[in-house]
Amino acid sequence: MTNIRKTHPLMKIINNSFIDLPTPSNISAWWNFGSLLGICLILQILTGLFLAMHYTSDTTTAFSSVTHICRDVNYGWIIRYLHANGASMFFICLYMHVGRGLYYGSYTFTETWNIGIILLFTVMATAFMGYVLPWGQMSFWGATVITNLLSAIPYIGADLVEWIWGGFSVDKATLTRFFAFHFILPFVVSALATVHLLFLHETGSNNPSGITSDSDKIPFHPYYTIKDILGALLLILVLTLLVLFSPDLLGDPDNYTPANPLSTPPHIKPEWYFLFAYAILRSIPNKLGGVLALVLSILILAIMPLLHTSKQRGMMFRPISQCLFWLLVADLLTLTWIGGQPVEHPYITIGQLASILYFMILLVLMPIASIIENNILKW
């Protein structure tokens, strides 16, 4: 009798994706982040669902409903902080996952890579709208500043902003629609993630060497299920430590003040995971230029396959490219730091230099380094 796991239409899909999937035998811990992102997404949907049961998307009651969740709902505080810090863990895993893709040349799977970029944009949009929901000072002013960026679009900008706001300022209509979108988008993300996996399984996984691994594959279960469980336990450990010991470490104190349109906070800034893009936005004195740089800072990932000039796929055997990659990581950390600083003398210049370096590394230095490495191999 044939195993039901291999014959049943539903079980067959699960089997071919997570059990009998042929996987390269040499993939490192950097390949754990896909499953960790799946865990983060499930956690966010579940905690978000329970929060939505008690949250009210009305400007007069939104802030107090979040307070009510933390004070009066059974274990509401832990659900709220798991959701808030779960988002931070989500982005840590996302950036590591994208970094892995850049380092090991996974962008040569163009369909998988492009859907990954769409996923990144969707998750960023979801997180931004979620940050608006508690209706604190930073929620309100963050929403005002970021949505206002669309007014830089020529001709239709101003109308577009008012259309998104549902009025002449960020108000009740804005909060209600942001809640609706914040609720539905994670399910869109789930669907996109499924398509992302579908395309990945068409080609099979990449591996650290960048060489085809068809001759040396092992079943996903038990080898990588065990490996993924270890990664998941470490993720849960870090998240639990964060939630139970310093839940507000990554948040902004201004968000514990109810939204007040008449009082602007001294420093308007988004959550830490958007600070690098915010720093790039601020480094350009022109509004439209800043918005374009902001979008391109993420969209630049889409042209990575075109900028790949190396004869090797990954950076495992390419020391010059490795140095540039880690310079890029340091540059992004610098931009993240700058994004959280006030707009004054040393920070403005550092931000502008870091922004130029970011685009220089990706567009100019890495392709040149790859060509140099190709020539070194001939000697």
From Swiss-Prot:
Any one Pfam family match given in the protein's UniProt record, by short name: Cytochrome_B
Binding site for heme b b566: 97, 196
CDD domains xref list: cytochrome_b_C, Cytochrome_b_N
Keywords: Electron transport, Heme, Iron, Membrane, Metal-binding, Mitochondrion, Mitochondrion inner membrane, Respiratory chain, Transmembrane, Transmembrane helix, Transport, Ubiquinone
Annotated a ubiquinone binding sites: 201
GO molecular function annotation: metal ion binding; ubiquinol-cytochrome-c reductase activity
Residues at which heme b b562 binds: 83, 182
Cofactor(s) this protein requires: heme b
Gene Ontology annotations of biological process type: mitochondrial electron transport, ubiquinol to cytochrome c
Annotated GO CC locations: mitochondrial inner membrane; respiratory chain complex III
TM regions (residue ranges): 33-53, 77-98, 113-133, 178-198, 226-246, 288-308, 320-340, 347-367
Membrane topology value: Multi-pass membrane protein
Cell compartment(s), UniProt: Mitochondrion inner membrane
UniProt cofactor note: Binds 2 heme b groups non-covalently.
Subunit structure, interactors included: The cytochrome bc1 complex contains 11 subunits: 3 respiratory subunits (MT-CYB, CYC1 and UQCRFS1), 2 core proteins (UQCRC1 and UQCRC2) and 6 low-molecular weight proteins (UQCRH/QCR6, UQCRB/QCR7, UQCRQ/QCR8, UQCR10/QCR9, UQCR11/QCR10 and a cleavage product of UQCRFS1). This cytochrome bc1 complex then forms a dimer.
Note: Heme 1 (or BL or b562) is low-potential and absorbs at about 562 nm, and heme 2 (or BH or b566) is high-potential and absorbs at about 566 nm.
Function: Component of the ubiquinol-cytochrome c reductase complex (complex III or cytochrome b-c1 complex) that is part of the mitochondrial respiratory chain. The b-c1 complex mediates electron transfer from ubiquinol to cytochrome c. Contributes to the generation of a proton gradient across the mitochondrial membrane that is then used for ATP synthesis.
Family assignment from sequence similarity: Belongs to the cytochrome b family.
Annotated protein name in UniProt: Cytochrome b
